[in-house]
Structure formats: structure tokens, C-alpha cells
């Protein structure tokens, strides 16, 4: 499950918080952070926190809205728009994705390629 659903004590979650923040702040070779969100769920506070940390680290970001195959094209478009608006994402920072039917795969590969080849410098 995602970090928001992990059944661990609050002190463990706080430890994760400091680990993630430290990693994002100190990992100079980090080229891209991909944050997975379920397109069917309303945007979560923990996702907003993660996106904020990534932005503070000035690392390129991709929010991958997963499970788009679980909704109609119109529903997916509307949900993706809400995610972009809620998190103030540029269009290229948020991609709808389905591992089941492959939608969004080409866009993800483009972003990953730009990140690892240096086209998306900090």
C-alpha cells in the first residue's frame, strides 16, 4: 500500500518523513521523483506533502495518476484536471497511466528519458 495506508505507528511515519526529506535534500544524483497517485481517489494531504518536499529539493517531478483504466475517458480527464489543479502541476508534470492497457506508457518513457539524459536539469 501507499505511504498513507501503511499500518504502522505514528512515530514510524514521522521517521519516514525525516528519511524522505533528508533523501530529497541530500541526494545530488537524483534526476526525477515519480509520485504515484490513484486517479480514482481525491488528492491526499500526504501526496501534497511529498510534492512540496520534491519542489523544495528542486528535483524534477512526475505525478503518475495510476489506474486510469478503471474509469471512462471523460472521468479520467476530469480527475487528472483536478489533480493538476490541486497540486498546481504543469501538464508535463502529471500523466494518467494504466499498467493494464498501456495508456500513458509512452509519455512516462519520454519523461524518464529526458530526466536520465539530462534534458530536465535541476
Regions inferred by a protein language model and the residue ranges of each:
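Canonical P-loop GTPase G-domain recognition
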Residues: 69-122
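Inter-motif core of Ras-like GTPase G domains
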Residues: 9-40, 51-64
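Conserved nucleotide-binding/hydrolysis micro-motifs of P-loop NTPases
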Residues: 2-5, 40-43, 67-72, 100-103
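Short, Lys/Arg-enriched charge-dense amphipathic segments
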Residues: 35, 49-63, 87-89, 113-122
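Residue-level preference for alpha-helix termini and adjacent loops
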Residues: 2-4, 15, 23, 29, ...
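Pocket-edge positions in alpha/beta enzyme catalytic cores
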Residues: 8, 12, 97-100
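Conserved G1/Walker A P-loop phosphate-binding module
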Residues: 1-11, 113-122
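Conserved catalytic-core segment of NTP-binding enzymes
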Residues: 42-58, 71, 76-83
Amino acid at each position: 500500500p501507499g505511504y498513507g495506508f501503511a499500518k504502522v505507528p505514528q512515530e514510524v511515519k514521522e521517521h519516514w518523513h525525516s528519511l524522505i526529506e533528508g533523501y530529497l535534500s541530500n541526494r545530488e544524483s537524483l534526476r526525477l521523483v515519480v509520485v504515484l497517485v490513484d486517479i480514482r481517489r481525491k488528492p491526499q494531504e500526504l501526496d501534497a506533502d511529498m510534492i512540496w518536499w520534491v519542489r523544495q529539493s528542486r528535483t524534477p517531478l512526475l505525478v503518475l495518476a495510476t489506474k486510469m483504466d478503471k474509469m471512462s475517458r471523460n472521468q479520467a480527464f476530469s480527475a487528472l484536471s483536478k489533480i493538476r489543479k490541486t497540486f498546481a502541476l504543469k501538464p508535463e508534470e502529471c500523466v494518467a497511466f494504466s499498467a493494464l492497457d498501456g495508456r500513458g506508457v509512452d509519455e512516462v518513457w519520454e519523461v524518464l528519458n529526458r530526466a536520465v539524459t539530462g534534458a530536465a536539469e535541476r
